[in-house]
């Protein structure tokens, strides 16, 4: 079977990801681009006698740029192999913006097939597009699709299998008359005949002209020293405008001509209902009300809608534990499988429905176009804290995970903005905290719904999200006033159209993220659960063909816990909670599996029950409950602020290029966590809430 590598390229919000999901389905994997940690999505399309490997490049408005993720597309296309081609995704409603990028790719001499999206919107708005004339103007093969419904995808797959579908085209636009004449004579003298060689020549000329947008000498270095000297001498004697801005102007002239000949807009693109929605969502007061209502709805749904699948998973794990218990004879293997592996890993798997709902909700906000509006709205608020709206997307991304959120700060050109965002991103409630929060909230805040509608647990979870935002903004202001004093950058963005999210695209997005969560967290949880099981059961002795394990208080882990208990008792924590805090430094969700293993070891031989029920039943020596609302609140606040994630600290070091900033991050967050938990628990005791 033949193989072909294809790069999927386009502007942000052009339908590129939806098209990628339509083509590849579940045949996807994620990784990183070589040399950087920007996420790379790859997928496979199987056609008769042909396997297409598609790489989804980061969405960008052009080639090159200051931010590192913007350079990725440029570097990949520049270093592509001869047989690698491009599918360029062009938004039919934003031709002017999309054609600027496409013309740059044509200049590079890359074989390209154009996919024109938004077919449904064209028809709905009665926009007339002359596809035949557009093909003729560009000299490329173009296929019109509806990426959401899949209309036109079969025609696209037919074209993908044909080599002639990917076409090279000579530069379509022209420089000014002096520059064009000079370039023509140079090409003749240097015997340049290919697109690629002409592209390198024009880049070298821009470099020699000291273009601020091009400070890379590698294009000039492609030529022999004699040629370099010749080019330098020629440019010194002639005042020519070889510059990026000039390119943009001359491309725009051609683009306006193409658009005027190929597309006709009988009605305004922006519909009145969209304008009315923007008046609400972007309103300085109503906009924030809508944002917090949406967040409140999310956290209510995490408990209301996920309860049934959570119970089913919990029952399934319990049933599996009981089956293994009936099949295997008593001994270390049985205990390891039931309490260590199933008890540890299963305790986190139970929370997958709620994590999936979180990813689904964020996906809906992003695909609908609301997330960009939330960024625009937050720019006003964040400006008061020394940040711009550019920081909002990475901060909101922290609701999934702080690691990609910190990597996402590469889109922020202002160094002070970027470093501040990196330092405060871990304060936003992430998906790793969800299993911890949900366990604590479900254990100590199991009250009837307010007014019979509003779930108390959902309200507490929303409060934790809101608290994380407020504290992150507060520390952003502190950092901007003390350490990163450079002026904040301006925030300019294009608001995408409102779209009805694609169910298929949402499914693939949620599936991929849940799979990634289980793959990364599950491996860590499995290893730590096995180690904890060993430490909580040993020392043990084998006597009369029977294994006799130590009581958990006298086991290795129990001894460590008892030593640290006096230090954490003022925070309201016992030794088991202390051990779970220690292990959760590897990954926050490990706290849940740690408690499951510790409590499972303590109650060996008893009937299996849910971890929440076990925690509620736990008593101190004086008969009072270990898990009270005050203890739960103290623990929630500790996990809200503590730097309990090695991966976050590692990526902070990588992105800042210094050990100083992850050290500062760890110290300020851990100090804040200990101080807040201590203050709340001690005040609660004084007020009689123990």
From Swiss-Prot:
Species this chain originates from: Leptospira biflexa serovar Patoc (strain Patoc 1 / ATCC 23582 / Paris)
Protein name: Fe(2+) transporter FeoB
One term of GO molecular function: GTP binding
Domain FeoB-type G: 3-166
Family statement drawn from the similarity comment of this UniProt entry: Belongs to the TRAFAC class TrmE-Era-EngA-EngB-Septin-like GTPase superfamily. FeoB GTPase (TC 9.A.8) family.
Keywords: Cell inner membrane, Cell membrane, GTP-binding, Ion transport, Iron, Iron transport, Membrane, Nucleotide-binding, Transmembrane, Transmembrane helix, Transport
CDD domains noted in UniProt: FeoB (cd01879)
Gene Ontology CC: plasma membrane
Topological type in the membrane: Multi-pass membrane protein
Subcellular location: Cell inner membrane
Membrane-crossing segments per the record: 280-300, 345-365, 387-407, 434-454, 459-479, 516-536, 623-643, 670-690
PANTHER family, alphabetized: FE(2+) TRANSPORTER FEOB (PTHR43185:SF1), FERROUS IRON TRANSPORT PROTEIN B (PTHR43185)
Entry-linked InterPro entries: Fe2_transport_prot-B, Fe2_transport_prot_B_C, FeoB_GTPase, G_FEOB_dom, Gate_dom, GTP-bd, P-loop_NTPase
Taxonomic lineage from the root: Bacteria, Pseudomonadati, Spirochaetota, Spirochaetia, Leptospirales
Top-rank lineage group of the source organism: Bacteria
Summary of the function given for this chain in its UniProt record: Probable transporter of a GTP-driven Fe(2+) uptake system.
Positions annotated to bind GTP: 10-17, 35-40, 56-59
Pfam family for this entry, one: FeoB_C
PROSITE patterns per UniProt: G_FEOB
């Amino acid at each position: 079977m033949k193989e072909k590598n294809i790069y999927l390229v386009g502007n942000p919000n052009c339908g590129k990801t939806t098209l990628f999901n339509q083509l590849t389905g579940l045949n996807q994997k994620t990784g990183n681009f070589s040399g950087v940690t920007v996420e790379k999505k790859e997928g496979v399309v199987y056609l008769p006698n042909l396997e297409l490997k598609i790489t989804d490049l980061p969405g960008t408005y052009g080639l090159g740029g200051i931010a590192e993720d913007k350079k990725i597309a440029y570097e990949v296309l520049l270093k592509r192999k001869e047989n690698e081609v491009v599918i360029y995704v062009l938004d039919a409603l934003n031709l002017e913006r999309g054609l600027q990028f496409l013309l740059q790719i044509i200049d590079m001499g890359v074989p390209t097939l154009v996919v024109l999206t938004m077919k449904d919107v064209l028809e709905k708005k009665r926009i007339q597009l002359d596809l035949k004339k557009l093909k003729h103007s560009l000299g490329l093969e173009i296929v019109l699709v509806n990426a959401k419904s899949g209309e036109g995808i079969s025609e696209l797959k037919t074209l993908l299998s044909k080599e002639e579908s990917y076409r090279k085209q000579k530069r379509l636009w022209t420089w000014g008359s002096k520059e064009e004449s000079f370039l023509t004579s140079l090409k003749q003298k240097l015997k340049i005949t290919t697109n690629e060689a002409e592209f390198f020549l024009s880049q070298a000329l821009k470099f020699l002209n000291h273009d601020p947008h091009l400070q890379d000498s590698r294009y000039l270095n492609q030529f022999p020293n004699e040629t370099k000297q010749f080019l330098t001498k020629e440019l010194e004697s002639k005042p020519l405008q070889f510059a990026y801005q000039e390119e943009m102007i001359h491309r725009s002239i051609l683009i306006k001509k193409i658009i005027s000949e190929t597309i006709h807009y009988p009605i305004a693109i922006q519909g009145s209902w969209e304008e009315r929605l923007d008046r609400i969502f972007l309103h300085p007061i109503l906009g924030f009300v809508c944002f917090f209502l949406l967040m409140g709805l999310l956290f209510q749904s995490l408990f209301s809608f996920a309860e049934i699948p959570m119970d089913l998973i919990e029952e399934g794990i319990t049933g599996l534990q009981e089956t293994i218990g009936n099949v295997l004879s008593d001994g270390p293997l049985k205990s390891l499988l039931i309490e260590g592996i199933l008890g540890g890993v299963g305790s986190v798997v139970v929370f997958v429905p709620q994590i999936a709902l979180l990813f689904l909700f964020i996906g809906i906000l992003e695909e609908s176009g609301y997330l960009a509006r939330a960024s625009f709205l937050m720019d006003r608020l964040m400006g008061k804290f020394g940040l711009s709206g550019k920081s909002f997307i990475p901060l909101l991304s922290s609701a999934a995970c702080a690691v990609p959120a910190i990597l996402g700060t590469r889109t922020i050109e202002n160094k002070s903005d970027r470093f501040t965002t990196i330092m405060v991103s871990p304060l936003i409630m992430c998906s790793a905290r969800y299993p911890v929060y949900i366990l604590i909230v479900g254990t100590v805040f199991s009250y009837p719904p307010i007014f019979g509608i509003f779930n108390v647990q959902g309200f507490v979870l929303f409060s934790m999200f809101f608290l994380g935002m407020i504290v992150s903004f507060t520390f952003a202001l502190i950092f901007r006033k003390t350490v990163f004093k450079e002026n904040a950058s301006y925030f300019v963005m294009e608001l995408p159209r409102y779209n009805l999210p694609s169910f298929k695209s949402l499914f693939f997005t949620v599936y991929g993220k849940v799979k990634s969560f289980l793959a990364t967290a599950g491996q860590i949880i499995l290893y730590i659960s096995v180690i904890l099981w060993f430490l909580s059961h040993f020392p043990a002795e084998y006597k009369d063909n029977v294994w006799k394990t130590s009581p958990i208080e006298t086991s290795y882990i129990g001894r460590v816990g008892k030593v640290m208990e006096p230090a954490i008792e003022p925070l309201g924590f016992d030794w088991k909670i202390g051990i779970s805090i220690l292990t959760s430094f590897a990954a926050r969700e490990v706290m849940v599996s740690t408690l499951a293993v510790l409590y499972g070891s303590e109650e060996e031989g008893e009937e299996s029950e849910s971890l929440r029920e076990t925690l509620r039943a736990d008593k101190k020596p004086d008969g009072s409950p270990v898990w009270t609302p005050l203890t739960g609140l103290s623990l929630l606040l500790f996990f809200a602020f503590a730097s309990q994630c090695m991966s976050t600290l590692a990526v902070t070091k990588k992105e800042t290029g210094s050990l100083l900033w992850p050290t500062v991050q760890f110290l300020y967050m851990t100090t804040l966590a200990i101080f807040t938990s201590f203050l709340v628990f001690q005040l609660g005791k004084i007020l009689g809430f123990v």
